[in-house]
């Protein structure tokens, strides 16, 4: 009887993990193709991103309210001094990362976007070394060389290569390295109380919106104000369809973050990292099949080389965590509370610093 119960529990956990991974795939791959599809007819990616931020803030606030009502515990609200001094740098880097990524969809294919964004792990490692979150090891140098070499091979003599778009997405990957490093440092400040990702999202979105607004005003403000799709609309039906499409993108963006957090809280950040590797493969295969992206043998070899570097990085993180009994923490880091999300019963399985390791792993997403 005990063995049967154990088998059932194992099977249930496997089915649950598979379901959460598939949910994450639906949102992650879905928003990539959705944004690419939307920017073909709506050429205002920065405005699109800002609307997504507003939707994410709305749903984050709603999630906090639901958790507060169910737990009868007040959610953390930072003072203005802490908010502007400690959260603002992370919010600005995050806004530029997301904004430039969506902007690049005007010029690059999904396959080139996916491959180049995978290189964010490279920049995360570099900035982690600069901020002394990682120690320089020969294995890390190998990871950097594999990812950089793979990126070079994927873009070398690519028939659908666009310099402007590649510069945008590579810039986003570079800023993404700063973003996730700052996010890790932000979460390690236990006194701020932002270990719960829903609270982090709630506090980041307003500053992200404000940080992206000047870029929007310079590059899209005038054109959008004269566009018949938004402000000078003549067809109410067209306006509602455009706003509905943008709002749906915001729901997908929040769903992506929520599914990531749910997967981590029910399994581990290692599961998310491994799932992210296979997600990149699925994205490229779908891009070649559905959108007709042209990927040569050399490009595939470069992609495989890059994925091997990412896989090595994930394996090193897993071994390092097991060897030290958990991810490396900065001095003064206290125990992190459980991820509550909307499911208060969700318990962590990877130790008190799971959110910290999770955000570092997100560079490949």
Curated annotation (Swiss-Prot):
Q: What induces it?
A: In hypoxic trophoblast cells.
Family label? Belongs to the TPT transporter family. SLC35C subfamily.
Q: What keywords tag this UniProt record?
A: Glycoprotein, Golgi apparatus, Membrane, Phosphoprotein, Transmembrane, Transmembrane helix, Transport
- Decide whether keyword Transport is in the record: yes
- Location, primary (coarse class): Golgi
Look up keyword Zinc and say if it applies: no
The membrane-spanning stretches of this chain are 14-34, 42-62, 104-124, 136-156, 158-178, 202-222, 242-262, 294-316
Q: What Gene Ontology cellular-component terms does the record carry?
A: cis-Golgi network; endoplasmic reticulum-Golgi intermediate compartment; endoplasmic reticulum-Golgi intermediate compartment membrane; Golgi apparatus; nucleoplasm
Localization, UniProt? Golgi apparatus, cis-Golgi network membrane; Endoplasmic reticulum-Golgi intermediate compartment membrane
Role: May play an important role in the cellular response to tissue hypoxia. May be either a GDP-fucose transporter that competes with SLC35C1 for GDP-fucose, or a factor that otherwise enhances the fucosylation of Notch and is required for optimal Notch signaling in mammalian cells.
Alphabetical GO biological process terms: negative regulation of gene expression; positive regulation of Notch signaling pathway; protein O-linked fucosylation; UDP-glucose transmembrane transport
Q: Which residues carry this modification: Phosphoserine?
A: 335-336
> Gene for this protein?
SLC35C2
- Membrane topology designation: Multi-pass membrane protein
Tissue distribution of the protein? Ubiquitously expressed although the level of expression is tissue dependent. Overexpressed in ovarian cancer.
Q: Which residues, renumbered to this chain, are glycosylated?
A: 102
The species this protein belongs to is: Homo sapiens
Ranges for the region named Disordered are: 344-365
For this entry, the protein name equals Solute carrier family 35 member C2
Q: What domain of life is recorded for the organism?
A: Eukaryota
Q: Which GO terms describe its molecular function?
A: antiporter activity
């Amino acid at each position: 009887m005990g063995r049967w119960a154990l088998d059932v529990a194992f099977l249930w956990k496997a089915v649950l993990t598979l379901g959460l991974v598939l949910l994450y795939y639906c949102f992650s791959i879905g928003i990539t193709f959705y944004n690419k599809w939307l920017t073909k007819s709506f050429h205002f990616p920065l405005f699109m991103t800002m609307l997504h931020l507003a939707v994410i803030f709305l749903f984050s606030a709603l999630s906090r309210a639901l958790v507060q009502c169910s737990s009868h515990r007040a959610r953390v609200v930072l003072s203005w001094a802490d908010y502007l001094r400690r959260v603002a740098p992370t919010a600005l880097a995050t806004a530029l990362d997301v904004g430039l990524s969506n902007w690049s969809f005007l010029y690059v294919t999904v396959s080139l976007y996916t491959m180049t964004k995978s290189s964010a792990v490279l920049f995360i490692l570099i900035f982690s070394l600069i901020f002394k979150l990682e120690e320089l090891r020969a294995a890390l140098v190998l990871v950097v060389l594999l990812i950089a070499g793979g990126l070079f091979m994927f873009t070398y003599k690519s028939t659908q290569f666009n310099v402007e778009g590649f510069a945008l997405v590579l810039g986003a990957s570079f800023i993404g390295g700063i973003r996730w490093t700052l996010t890790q440092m932000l979460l390690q400040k236990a006194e701020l109380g932002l270990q719960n990702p829903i609270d982090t999202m709630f506090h980041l979105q307003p500053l992200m919106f404000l940080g992206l607004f000047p870029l929007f005003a310079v590059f899209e403000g005038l054109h959008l104000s004269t566009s018949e799709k938004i402000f000078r609309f003549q067809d109410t039906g067209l306006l509602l369809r455009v706003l509905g499409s943008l709002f749906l993108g915001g729901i997908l963006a929040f769903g992506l973050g929520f599914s990531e957090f749910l997967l981590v809280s029910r399994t581990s950040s290692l599961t998310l990292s491994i799932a992210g590797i296979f997600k990149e493969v699925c994205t490229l295969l779908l891009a070649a099949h559905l959108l007709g992206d042209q990927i040569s043998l050399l490009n595939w070899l470069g992609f495989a080389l890059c994925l091997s570097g990412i896989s090595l990085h994930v394996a090193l993180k897993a071994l390092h965590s097991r060897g030290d009994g958990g991810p490396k923490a900065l001095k003064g880091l206290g125990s992190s509370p459980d991820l509550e999300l909307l499911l208060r019963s969700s318990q962590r399985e990877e130790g008190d610093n799971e959110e910290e390791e999770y955000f570092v792993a997100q560079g490949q997403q």
